[in-house]
Amino acid sequence: EIQKLKKEKMLCWLYDEDRWPSGSAGGIVTKNVQYRSRFLVFEPEGVDKEEKEEFMSAAKAVRSKNRFLLGSYRIILNEEGRLKSYQSLKTEKPNEAGEIWSAWLEVSGDTPWFNNQAYVNTLDKNAINQFIEITHQEYYKRFADEFGKTIPGIFTDEPQTCHKEVLSEPFEKKAVILPFTDDFDDTFQKRYGFSILECIPELIWERENGEISQARY
């Protein structure tokens, strides 16, 4: 109790979550699918969907069927596994060389770690505002008089995006997960003048000529 702490001349640091990492308010925020974590899935044509982890104490991507296509690409690698060429496909051209990879925006599925909900979309200001309203503002409603006194602050525990993945070797055929959100490409274009979706293969493979991809930085 606050009064007991005051009597003992102790401070009360508040915690804003029921477990690590902060953001979902114990799954309350992410009952609204709009506020769930999103991620980009980049995968080769015909790849089998990976097994879902039974238990996961992290904000790693949780695969689901809730996704939509962002784009498809024809990829050609050289003998060393470097990116020789690629093109964004608007229409399928089955007789051309190369392998087809596709990028999907996927919404996080349920996981027991977040009370059978999902982690929050930390790239969405509205989602985080909802988290603050449910947690920090609720604390303030109850203990406003003690903020800045007995209560010096609120501890937020490592909010994060989904974990970024890479291929273990350039010819590996598996899905690669990257942090992403609904307006990521629009925001990127406004800031840098080109679409990140046009350059997704450069985030996965090294260029054949050894040049550094501007899109990575």
List PLM regions with ranges:
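Mature extracytoplasmic enzyme cores
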Residues: 1-217
